[in-house]
């Protein structure tokens, strides 16, 4: 399901869609934990644009989204253009503090959309937590505390920081954390 707050942002910005690049915003809006990905959201659909290394993971983590392999399209901008043309998107917001100029220029040339800087609007949305996000944060804190209490006994002379880091990572997983770092 498309993030309701993103839909509200599209309406308030008076745009047809938004192009996200920051990994933390892509993850927040999509749930995707991989890297090197972009998210193009309209009011009706969300497209996770990624490369072949992540398409399988994306399909599992974001089953409600359309996964687009940008390498098959030739470029990120071309993949975005295919989507914007398909959905008749004319007004596209983008993360102006994250999209490099070259990609911005390519988006302008390829999509034919009028581009609007999103500023920190998505970051600000992400800062205000829902009850579900608060519950997840509480559980993460509980997991971290339990792992920390387990590692205290391992801290002694002769034990390296690398060993402690490896043990702490293991304890975190045993206590219920994701095994994948992000």
What name fits each language-model region?
Residues 1-47, 78, 82-88, 109, ...:
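Terminal domain-start leader segments
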Residues 2-5, 75-180:
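Flexible, acidic/His-enriched mid-domain "rim/lid" segments that flank
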Residues 17, 179-182:
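A short coil-to-beta-strand element that immediately follows conserved catalytic motifs
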Residues 20-21, 68-72, 116-120:
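Conserved beta-strand termini and adjacent loop/short-helix elements that scaffold enzyme active sites
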Residues 23, 50-56, 98-104:
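Short, polar loop motifs at secondary-structure junctions
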Residues 42, 61-64, 110-112:
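Short, structured coil segments at secondary-structure junctions
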Residues 51-78:
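Compact, glycine/acidic-enriched structural inserts
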């Amino acid at each position: 399901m498309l993030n309701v707050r993103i839909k509200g942002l599209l309406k308030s910005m008076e745009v047809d869609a938004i192009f996200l690049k920051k990994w933390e915003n892509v993850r927040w809006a999509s749930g995707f934990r991989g890297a090197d990905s972009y998210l193009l959201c309209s009011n009706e659909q969300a497209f996770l644009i990624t490369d072949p290394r992540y398409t399988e993971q994306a399909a599992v983590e974001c089953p409600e989204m359309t996964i687009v392999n940008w390498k098959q399209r030739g470029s990120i901008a071309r993949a975005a253009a295919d989507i914007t043309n398909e959905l008749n998107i004319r007004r596209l917001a983008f993360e102006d503090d994250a999209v490099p100029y070259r990609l911005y220029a390519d988006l302008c040339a390829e999509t034919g959309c009028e581009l609007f800087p999103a500023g920190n609007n998505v970051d600000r949305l992400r800062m205000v937590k829902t009850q579900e996000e608060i519950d997840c944060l509480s559980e993460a804190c509980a997991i971290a505390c339990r792992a920390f209490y387990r590692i205290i006994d391992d801290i002694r002379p002769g034990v390296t920081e690398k060993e402690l880091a490896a043990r702490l990572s293991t304890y975190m997983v045993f206590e219920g954390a994701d095994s994948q770092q992000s």
